[in-house]
Amino acid sequence: MESLYRQGVWMAEALQQNSRSLEDLWLVASHMGDPKAAVLLVFPVVFYIHRRTGIAVLWVAALSEWLNLVFKWILFGERPYWWIGQSGLFSEKPPEVQQFQSTCESGPGSPSGHAMVTSAVWWVIISSLASFSQAYTGSKILSAVLYLLYAVFLGCVGLSRIFILAHFPHQVVAGLLTGVLLGVFLKRSVPERRPLLFFFRFSMALLGAALIFHAVLEKTGIDLSWSISLAKRWCSRSEWVRMDTAPFSSLNRDAGVLLGLGLAQYWKPGGWTLPRAPRTLCLALSSLALHYISRFPLPTVPPLLFYSLFFLKYSIVPQVVMVLVPGFVHLLTAKPKRE
């Protein structure tokens, strides 16, 4: 693996030196590939365009990120920003690279979660768009263009993760391929109109299974906090190592989102049928609400309190998008019945 890691560092160095003018593009691409962007940015937009596809986006995002966490616990995987210093191989001639605010994620590196979740979620969206365009226009060229744009977007997300030193190239490729396979598989079973008990059990199963697996690995002598220690040691700025990028934060986000999805469908099973203009208003209000929810600060001590509140925070997201905001807009725009 050492040779693979060396080549990855050289590629990151070359990418930073030769595309410095594209730094803003890479940072935006990395942000758009963040698993939480699938929940906070992509889900509302898709949901107000097509309800079932929006639910599929949330479902696939949660399950693919959870599986990514399990894979990382099994495969470990270094990250470039800490491996450069930890390996001791570059003491004489360190690579000319820099870290960024989004570099210092504290979980293991393989496979890339950004690549895996993004490729899974956007497969659901692009394949749905391609099916729609094929049905209404009969144009295979348009479908091909959509899949080409999908590939270009994934390429940008993957390169951005290498550029900011968050992942090695082989970790990105592994994440992209695994994500596409998950997108194809999970799209077949979208839990629309499933009972609340289904989501409650699924949410608790994700939490329970991950915690049991974590405990078993620790019992065998595997220290799963190794990556957090390395992140704190080698990140160039300590404030860039945040609890919301830790593995247990991902776990609680996924479980919270699924429980919230169940609650949203329980409160209003069929949702509201709104015309295009009210749906646009819903999107604007939801985006504003989710912006403030995502930025709401949580106490980081004790950790159990942080993770519990993090779970609740993301369980609110589907309810805001699917129930609270559409219900409010429905009340505002509904025409009074004539007697």
UniProtKB/Swiss-Prot annotation:
Substrate binds at R79, R161. Pathway: Carbohydrate biosynthesis; gluconeogenesis. Keywords: Endoplasmic reticulum, Gluconeogenesis, Hydrolase, Membrane, Transmembrane, Transmembrane helix. It is a multi-pass membrane protein. Residues 1-26, 76-114, 165-169, 217-308 are lumenal. Coiled coil: none annotated. This is Glucose-6-phosphatase 3. It comes from Danio rerio. The gene is g6pc3.
